[in-house]
Design a protein with these regions (language model features):
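Residue-level recognition of single "structural anchor" positions
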Residues: 1-138
Length: 138
């Protein structure tokens, strides 16, 4: 009966911009900054928009190019914001890796590596899933 289970394309039902905004709050609680710590000016236009809503910016101070994922475990990730938010939500809720991987269409071993990275960061006090748990807006 396991194969007969109804699967919803949940990541297609989640708003990318809202997921981006949540990740921005989680990954950069003090605002987006370049890798050298220079703040993103509120009036600065993106350097590159090809992955919107993930926008690349070029720092006006040092010239470094950065985005939402720079300096995080998601650096160089090609996953959509919605997929990452749903992954974090599943981990926060204790969903078994195999079920989460099936639901999100991800490789189980890749998801397991990410889960271990996230759990290590939480243990070191460098990351919290609280904003994911408490973000109940739909």
């Amino acid at each position: 009966a396991r194969d007969a289970m109804l699967r919803f394309p949940i990541d297609d039902l989640v708003d990318e911009q809202r997921c981006h905004d949540l990740l921005l709050r989680v990954l950069h609680p003090d605002g987006l900054r370049c890798p050298r710590g220079h703040a993103l000016p509120p009036d600065q236009a993106p350097h590159d928009r090809h992955r919107a809503p993930i926008l690349d910016y070029r720092c006006r101070e040092c010239g470094a190019v950065y985005n939402l994922f720079t300096g995080s475990i998601w650096c160089r990730s090609r996953l959509r914001c919605s997929k990452i938010v749903l992954m974090l939500r599943g981990i926060a809720q204790g969903v078994p890796t195999i079920h989460l991987a099936e639901e999100l269409g991800l490789d189980r071993s890749h998801l397991l590596r990410r889960r271990h990275q996230i759990q290590s960061l939480i243990e070191e006090g460098l990351f919290s899933l609280d904003p994911i748990r408490s973000d109940h807006r739909s």
